[in-house]
C-alpha cells in the first residue's frame, strides 16, 4: 500500500483508499500508508460515521495516533506539521449504499469531520430495489439519490457517486462534486 500511494501521489493524483467497515486499525493503516483520504463503505448510521471520523482524525477531532512517519516523509514535511495539517487536508468520506443509510443520511452528514458522502448506486439499488443495476428512472431510487445530495448540500459536504459509463459520468458531473468512472477491474477487463 505504501508504494501504491506514493506512486499515485507522484502522478499528481490524490490516492484514496476504500475500506469496508469502520475498523480503526484499517483506517489508520491506510492513512499511515500515505493515503490522502479514505472512503469507508456501507455506512448506515451517524454512530458509524462518528467512528470513521474518530479513527481518521488526530486529537482534538479524533483519536488517531501518530503512527508511522511515512506520510510526513512522502509529503516532505516534518511530523508535527503533518499532524497539524492532516485534519484539514485528508478526506474522510463515507459511502451511503443502503436503505438504512438513506434513512439516516441527514444525521450522517451532520457528523463533524465527515468531508464527503459517496453514493454506491449498485449496492443502493440492491438494497432499495432488490436488483442491480438500477435503470435510473425508478422513483424510489431517484428519491434516494436526491435525498443524499440534499443532505450533503445542507451540511456543506462534498457528494460523489459511481458512474457506470462515460456518458452517465458527464451527466452526473452536473450534480455531483466528484464522479468515479467504473471500476479498475472493469477497465482492465476492457
Q: PLM ranges: what are they?
A:
Residues 29, 107, 170-172:
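Well-formed, non-transmembrane alpha-helical positions, independent of function
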Residues 32-37, 57-58, 110-116, 173-179:
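Glycine-enriched alpha-helix->loop->beta-strand junction motifs that scaffold or abut catalytic
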Residues 1-24, 28-32, 54-62, 84-87, ...:
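Alpha-helix-loop-beta-strand connector modules within alpha/beta enzyme cores
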Residues 25, 37-112, 121-126:
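Conserved anion-binding
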Residues 20-21, 43-45, 121-123, 164-165, ...:
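Short, ordered loop/turn segments at secondary-structure junctions
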Amino acid at each position: 500500500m505504501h508504494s501504491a500511494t506514493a506512486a499515485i501521489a507522484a502522478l499528481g493524483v490524490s490516492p484514496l483508499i476504500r475500506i469496508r467497515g469502520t475498523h480503526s486499525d484499517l483506517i489508520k493503516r491506510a492513512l499511515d500508508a500515505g493515503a490522502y483520504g479514505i472512503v469507508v463503505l456501507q455506512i448506515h448510521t451517524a454512530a458509524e460515521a462518528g467512528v470513521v471520523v474518530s479513527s481518521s482524525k488526530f486529537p482534538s477531532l479524533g483519536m488517531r495516533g501518530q503512527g508511522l512517519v511515512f506520510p510526513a516523509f512522502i509529503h516532505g514535511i516534518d511530523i508535527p506539521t503533518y499532524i497539524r495539517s492532516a485534519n484539514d487536508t485528508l478526506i474522510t468520506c463515507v459511502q451511503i449504499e443502503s436503505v438504512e443509510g438513506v434513512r439516516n443520511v441527514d444525521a450522517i452528514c451532520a457528523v463533524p469531520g465527515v468531508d464527503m458522502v459517496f453514493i454506491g448506486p449498485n449496492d443502493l439499488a440492491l438494497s432499495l430495489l432488490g436488483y442491480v443495476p438500477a435503470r435510473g428512472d425508478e422513483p424510489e431510487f431517484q428519491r434516494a439519490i436526491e435525498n443524499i445530495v440534499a443532505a450533503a448540500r445542507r451540511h456543506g459536504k462534498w457528494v460523489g457517486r459511481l458512474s457506470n459509463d462515460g456518458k452517465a459520468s458527464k451527466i452526473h458531473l452536473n450534480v455531483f462534486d466528484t464522479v468515479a468512472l467504473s471500476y479498475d477491474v472493469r477497465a482492465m477487463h476492457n
